[in-house]
Swiss-Prot record:
An annotated GO BP: protoporphyrinogen IX biosynthetic process from glutamate
Organism whose genome encodes this protein: Shewanella sp. (strain W3-18-1)
Keyword Transferase: no
Name of this protein: Glutamyl-tRNA reductase
Top EC class, one word: oxidoreductase
Protein family per UniProt: Belongs to the glutamyl-tRNA reductase family.
Binding-site residues for substrate, renumbered to this chain: T49, C50, N51, R52, S105, E110, P111, Q112, Q116
Record text about domains: Possesses an unusual extended V-shaped dimeric structure with each monomer consisting of three distinct domains arranged along a curved 'spinal' alpha-helix. The N-terminal catalytic domain specifically recognizes the glutamate moiety of the substrate. The second domain is the NADPH-binding domain, and the third C-terminal domain is responsible for dimerization.
Documented EC number(s): 1.2.1.70
Keyword Oxidoreductase (UniProt): yes
Record pathway: Porphyrin-containing compound metabolism; protoporphyrin-IX biosynthesis; 5-aminolevulinate from L-glutamyl-tRNA(Glu): step 1/2
Gene: hemA
Gene3D superfamilies with a match to the protein in the record: Glutamyl-tRNA reductase, N-terminal domain, NAD(P)-binding Rossmann-like Domain
The protein's role, per its UniProt record: Catalyzes the NADPH-dependent reduction of glutamyl-tRNA(Glu) to glutamate 1-semialdehyde (GSA).
Amino acid sequence: MSLVAIGINHKTATVDLREKVAFSPDKIHDAMKSLASRTRSGEAVIVSTCNRTELYCNNGDEADIIEWLEEYHGLDHKDVAPCLYNYHGQTAVKHLMRVASGLDSLILGEPQILGQVKQAFAKAKEAGTVALTIDRLFQNTFSVAKKVRTETEIGAAAVSVAFAAVSMAKHIFSSLSTTKVLLIGAGETIELVAKHLKDNGVASMVVANRTLERAQGMCEEFGATAITLAQIPDYLPKADIVISSTASPLPILGKGMVEKALKQRRHQPMLLVDIAVPRDIEPEVADLDDAFLYTVDDLHSIIEQNMASRKEAAEQAELITEEQSYLFMDWVRSLESVDSIREYRNQSMAIKDELVERALNKLAQGGDTEQVLIELANRLTNKLIHAPTQALTAASRQGDLNTLGQLRTALGLDKN
């Protein structure tokens, strides 16, 4: 039994090459079936994201798997080979556990990768490319990733601008279940902010954007309300939290607009987070009572502190993945011993059945019972001791005292 992991990621290859070796969702089902057919066990899982493509196989030949990858995507070996990494056995197990725990991610400890690995495993099960070993490997991996999350602080501290903005909001309001949020912009960063807010159970969201259609498309996903930038003055007084990230060259929220909104709110506090460059919110807003303005620079200082915290947590997480990968390999070895015992018993039973059948035939033909039984005993003894005798002879001739000692112990020769 041999586990193999072969891959390419953001550390080893350019975006251009990563795009070429990626597997589209509509083709990955057939791709896993094709890859599995190149292994002796029929087991394979493909993890393909924007930052990595990795092939996990049981009882597969490394060179054959690499050849399959190159053939599938029509790529030259010289272009792909320098960017590939490969792991075997315990190191392959540990690598998968590190990946699922976010220890190998572009952003250390990011949680999205675990969901992506789970999705890849689910697709492999649908494709029928999962059996005992791969199933146990991935189930153990998910348990390890959960253990890393619960026993370390790897995911507790925000290390992305979007996550940091929402974390700050949670810190100030303690619970977001009763807060109303106004998001300004509809780009990737605001989309991530909306996702984090939804995950944290925010009461309601309004998305303001220059292009209403773009905002509406995003709002459908997150159950938010879409408005234009011109409508912001009408919605601002209702917002407990304002998070803005647009590409506007001029500020969108001025001191006067915010001051008016605060009066309508009867001076209930308002958190404003400006993560745009150049800034979307006039810095003078910070002078207003009840307005708490934070900029992207404030978030970056938080992120830097948190990254240091995550690195400390990562050291603990590495120990967990190391320990758990060895425990998994103990299970693999126990499985191999079970297979060996089963094969040995089946072989012995086959020898016994063959010789008993031969003896019964002789008795049926009128053979002497005593003679037939003696012949059966002799033949059975010779057959069963043939392989051990050869092994003892070979070890003696080679002067391999260690193997000789193990054989003597296994055969019970050293017992008093």
